[in-house]
Each structure stands twice: as C-alpha cells, then as structure tokens.
Amino acid sequence: MKTHYNLRVIAARAVAQVLDQGQSLGALLPPLQAPLSEKDRALLQELCFGIMRVLPQLEWLLRQLMAKPLTGKQRPVHYLLMVGLYQLTYTRIPPHAALAETVEGAVAMKRPQFKGLINGVLRQFQRQQPALLADAERQDIRHLHPSWLQKRILAAWPAQYAQIIDANNQRPPMWLRVNRLHHSRDAYLALLAGTDIAAVAHSQLPDAIRLEMPCNVGRLPGFDRGWVTVQDASAQGCALLLAPQNSETILDLCAAPGGKTTHILEIAPAARVMAVDVDGQRAARIHDNLQRLGMQAEVVIGDGRTPDAWRSGMLFDRILLDAPCSATGVIRRHPDIKWLRRDGDIAELAELQRQILCAAWRVLKLGGTLLYATCSILPEENRGQIAAFLADHPDALLQETGDAAAPGLQCLPVPTSGDGFFYAKMIKETQAC
C-alpha cells in the first residue's frame, strides 16, 4: 500500500467485499490495517464495523437521497457514499473533513466524475439530517437486522426480543481474563488502576474483568507477557464449566483461535491438552496464543467429524466442543454476521454440529465429561440439538447447568455483560448401546 492512501476508499472496498463477495471483516481487516497508523487502524475498524451495524438505515437513507440507485460499475461509489453518511451520523469527525475526504475518494477510486454527485448527496443529507433520521426510526428497518433473523429471534425469545435486538445493535464491552498463574484478579485490577484504566470485576466469573472503556491491548499491563487475555465473559464460562484437572487428557475441539485452550491450561497447567481445528490458518493463531502465554499443547489440524484421522488412538477425560454455529450470540462483536448468514444456513449448521458432537462422544472415556458450547441463541443449535442427542445416546447423562426444565444453560447478550452463549455438560455413564 502506498504511503498516501484514502481511508474512506479502503473502508468502502472492505464493505463491498463483505456484501458482494461474502467475506468476513475478521479476515479482511487485519492485512488492510497492518500498514496503517494506530489511529487509522481504529478508524477503519469503526467505519467498517459501524456500517455493518446500521446497514439498513444507510441503505434507506440513500434511497431517499438519490433518484436512482448506483449499480454495476457504479456500485463502489454507493459504498463510498455509505462511508460518508456513517461519518456524518455516527462519528466525531468534523463534517467538513468527512465530506472532503469522501469526495476525494472518488479520485482515489479513479471515478472523478462522481465527485459532484458525492458532494451533492452528502450536503443534501446534512441539510435534511434531523428529519431523515427521525423518519428512519419510524421504518421497519429500525431494528437493523435482516427480516429472517428477526423472525427467528422473535419465535425463540418473544419476551426477550427487544433486549436481544438492542444488545446486538450496541458496541460490545471489552472483557479480560486474568491469567491466574501470574496474578490474582484483584492484583491485576490494581495494575490497571495504576495505568488509569477503569475496570470492574465480574460478579461470578473469578478471572473476568470488564473495562469501562475499550482500549488497545498495548496499554494492558503485561499483555505481551501473558498476564491477561481479551476474552468475552460468556466465553470464559466454557473452561470453568469444563472444570479440567491436572491429571487429565483434554480435547479442545474446534479450538481456534485458542482462547479456551489457554484458559484450560491456566486452570489445569499440568493437563495434557490437544487443540484441534479444521482451519490451518486459524490453527496457527492457537500457536500464537500459546506462545504469548508461555504454554504448551498439541495443536492439530483436523476435522472434528473424523477424529480417528488425528487422535492416534487417544481417548479423552474431558472434551470441550465449541461447535461451529450461526454466531447469532455475538452479532454485536461481529455485525457483518447479520449480512453473511442466510436462513438456510441454520439447518446445515445444526447437521454439522450433530456430526461433530456424535464423533466427539465416541472418543470420550467412560465417566468422562463433554461440554457442548455455541455462541448462538437459536434453539435448533442449542437445546434442540442436545435434546436430540440425549434421545439418541442413553449413555449421556446431562449435568444441571441452568433451567432444570430445559437442557443446558442459555445466556442471552446483555449490553454490560457477556455475549449470547449456550452450554450443555454431559457425562458418559455406561457403554454405548
């Protein structure tokens, strides 16, 4: 990338790659951010994630401001206009600077003939902004979710629907997990206070701290030395519920990027841990996290559906299966999920989960424990999945983790607490039938 760049164009192109090519921001942004200054890295993330969060509103605004949509080869200008509207509505960038940089983006895109159009549309929005935004709040798009997902959430959680939608549309809190092998949580809170980082302890999770304001990990005391890890509170519940012991052989299945693997080793540093993921690039991040925390585990690239291909005959005392899922519990953290997922994906994911769960059960020792987890809030992937599994596996004894009337524990996203997550803990009682 050249030294001189137009950040608005980079953002517009990233948005296009998500919406037109189905790529995720999590994969797209790191290489785009690498050559940028810290300030511009943060701004690029704000623009891209923010646009994904409020996409229906921006699309609606453009329909009001333009006589006809930009299509075909003009589509990149459509996304550049989105970047302009987002800056004017949701950032503290001075309007004149936001407008000037966005207009100049047309030149950087080699579409200078659109400078006048971009300038005119954004200035018209500035004049009509209060009325347009008020009108947008009266439209169906105000929920900022695709209709299929709204219907599924409403059907599953009618009483909590508004809370879930609201939480999904907010910026996520930043949670830390203190490495108990280095510091107590209270000691680390004192270190944060000494660097003017305000934080509060979780009321139930022993290692969890929430920052009052998110910050760059470079500001966190001892981050590079493995004193602390960024991990949502709900995700921290996985290793705690698994309750690993030092003498055990433990499988972390679908383990990338390794946050739960390292948490297992913080709780049981003498355990033998195998971390398996089907994606080689994501598995490399497990190595990175282990190295940062000074830990060792056997990292394997393998398909959870075919454990005989990689387990070398091993059976496991405990298995953590953080199953691939719709990620509907972490939309606030990954708002592009709303536009990457399709209604038909849910049944396909549920079948994949079933296959991995059944395969994992086969390599669990008698008397062993399996914790099934997802970051979904949809019953087909969670309680429905576990109910079907229990019906097919009489050797599976469900451990009570939540509501006794339904299998498993379902957490919903809460603005100042954890993401949406599901857990079901099962013990293998007898020989399989």
Curated annotation (Swiss-Prot):
It comes from Sodalis glossinidius (strain morsitans). InterPro entries: MeTrfase_RsmB-F_NOP2_cat (IPR049560), MeTrfase_RsmB-F_NOP2_dom (IPR001678), NusB-like_sf (IPR035926), NusB_RsmB_TIM44 (IPR006027), RCMT (IPR023267), rRNA_ssu_MeTfrase_B (IPR004573), rRNA_ssu_MeTfrase_B_ent (IPR023541), RsmB-like_ferredoxin (IPR054728). Belongs to the class I-like SAM-binding methyltransferase superfamily. RsmB/NOP family. The active site is at residue 375. Its EC number is 2.1.1.176. GO terms for molecular function: RNA binding; rRNA (cytosine-C5-)-methyltransferase activity. PROSITE patterns: NOL1_NOP2_SUN, SAM_MT_RSMB_NOP. This is Ribosomal RNA small subunit methyltransferase B.
